[in-house]
Amino acid sequence: MRTTLALVTAVVLLLVPAEAPAKVRSCHTRADFNLLISSARNMRCKTARRDLRRHHGSISFRFRTPGGFRCRRVSGNALAGQWRCVKQRKAYRFEFSD
């Protein structure tokens, strides 16, 4: 009985589909004259552009967009660099230069 239960459990675990791989898109979309969206994961480039355009605050080391994305600088300095914005499974990267 235990072997049958263990065998059934193993078969069920093998048949459960794995998590779908993340779809990463390469973008070359400008949200503004000094904001270039370079890539987007699990979202369209147009959606990332719209989210970044709705942010009217300063581009600091860390900030949050109105769409709920948490953004953080991953390289560069306050005047030029690359930021990564994340919300659950969605993410995008953008480059800023002043």
Identify what each model region corresponds to.
Residues 18-22:
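Sec/Tat signal peptide C-region and signal peptidase I cleavage site
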Residues 6-15:
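Bacterial N-terminal signal peptides
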Residues 23-34:
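Short N-terminal segments immediately surrounding and downstream of signal-peptide cleavage
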Residues 33-38, 46, 50-98:
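Extracytosolic low-complexity repeat regions of secreted or lipid-anchored proteins
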Residues 1-4:
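Positively charged n-region of N-terminal signal peptides that target proteins for export
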